Curated annotation (Swiss-Prot):
NDH-1 is composed of 14 different subunits. Subunits NuoA, H, J, K, L, M, N constitute the membrane sector of the complex. It is a multi-pass membrane protein. It comes from Protochlamydia amoebophila (strain UWE25). Disulfide bonds: none annotated. PROSITE patterns: COMPLEX1_ND1_1 (PS00667), COMPLEX1_ND1_2 (PS00668). The gene is nuoH. One of its GO terms (biological process) is aerobic respiration. It is found in: Cell inner membrane. This is NADH-quinone oxidoreductase subunit H. NDH-1 shuttles electrons from NADH, via FMN and iron-sulfur (Fe-S) centers, to quinones in the respiratory chain. The immediate electron acceptor for the enzyme in this species is believed to be ubiquinone. Couples the redox reaction to proton translocation (for every two electrons transferred, four hydrogen ions are translocated across the cytoplasmic membrane), and thus conserves the redox energy in a proton gradient. This subunit may bind ubiquinone. The keyword Cell inner membrane applies. GO terms for molecular function: NADH dehydrogenase activity; oxidoreductase activity, acting on NAD(P)H, quinone or similar compound as acceptor; quinone binding.
């Protein structure tokens, strides 16, 4: 029992370290990608090829003054960034990064926790992220923050419906809620080939769930200064920032797990295949941000309720018919 607990703690520490490092360098890579697409140089001056830029940004944020605006709800104001960060981290408790490896004569699963109802927990953890957004907007005592928080709440709740329906089709197709079993069932064929519409719906909603362009209405600079981020700076802002990029990694890892065979690929390098698939999705997020204009808020909500939800319901009915009948 104690050995199992130690193994879980070691897995958790390794995953957290990798996620924080990946999120830090995602900010650097995104700036490089956007600069190249916009015919600019990007941040290339700090260290060789700019590789120390994330470290410099972290030191800058760490050294900033611990400022708190007047008349804020102090406890909630400080709690909101933590909620955004930790809800993103919790998702990786369920993600299987690979199969089984043998270390010191002991078989180790490359997954922190294999829960029989993993898909349900995924939806639950992703739903909790909305609290960080709405509480940050409400506690900041700022009209821009409040409007951004309300926008983010409405957007995330609206797009969770088609996302949940798309994941339900995966459950119907595989007959299990365990993420590890879903990956193992994709050893010979990925679910993207049998559930392409479900993947498209999931991928579109993942942009809305992460508040990324073209669905970044909660923090639209031209309208809301910085939205629910407006009154945050220093490490509190860094917590929101890390939460956003870890959330991008999370939705990319979920897409890889549920639709693209997880760690399966040619050769005996499961972790590398998993990482490569996730990296491709992360690059698409960056590419879309650099190339697509932002939706209007009414277009965003109309698209979610009038287009995605009906298509997701119809797709679920068709999948259920061909699976169960």
């Amino acid at each position: 029992m104690i050995d199992d607990l130690i193994i879980i703690l070691i897995k958790s520490a390794v995953v957290i370290l990798l996620l924080f490092t990946a999120a830090a360098y995602m900010t650097f890579l995104e700036r490089i990608v956007m600069a190249r697409l916009q015919l600019r140089m990007g941040p290339v001056r700090v260290g060789p090829f700019g590789l120390f830029q994330p470290l410099a940004d972290g030191i800058k944020l760490l050294c900033k003054e611990r400022f708190q605006p007047a008349n804020v709800e102090t406890f909630v104001y400080w709690l909101a960034p933590g909620i955004s960060l930790f809800t993103a981290l919790f998702i990786f408790v369920l993600i299987p990064f690979g199969g089984v490896v043998e270390i010191a004569g002991r078989l180790i699963y490359l997954q922190i926790a294999d829960i029989n109802v993993g898909v349900v927990f995924l939806l639950a953890f992703s739903s909790l992220a909305v609290y960080g957004v709405v509480l940050a907007g409400w506690a900041s005592n700022n009209r821009y923050s409040l409007i951004g928080g309300l926008r983010g709440t409405a957007q995330m709740i609206s797009y969770e419906i088609p996302m949940g329906l798309s994941l339900l089709t995966v459950v119907l197709s595989t007959g299990t809620l365990s993420l590890r079993e879903i990956v193992e069932l994709q050893q010979n064929h990925w679910l993207i080939w049998t559930n392409p519409i479900s993947f498209i719906i999931y991928f579109i909603t993942s942009f809305a769930e992460t508040n990324r362009a073209p669905f970044d209405l909660p923090e639209a600079e031209q309208e809301l200064t910085a939205g629910y981020h407006t009154e945050y700076g220093g490490m509190k802002f860094a917590a929101f920032f890390l939460g956003e990029y870890i959330n991008i990694l999370a939705v990319s890892a979920i897409a890889t797990t549920l639709f693209f065979g997880g760690w399966h690929g040619p050769g005996d390098i499961p972790i590398l295949w998993f990482g490569l698939k996730v990296a491709i999705f992360v690059f698409i997020f960056m590419w879309v941000r650099a190339t697509m204009p932002r939706f209007r808020y009414d277009q965003l909500m109309s698209f979610g309720w009038k287009v995605l939800i009906p298509i997701a319901i119809l797709n679920l009915i068709i999948t259920a018919y061909f699976t169960l009948v």
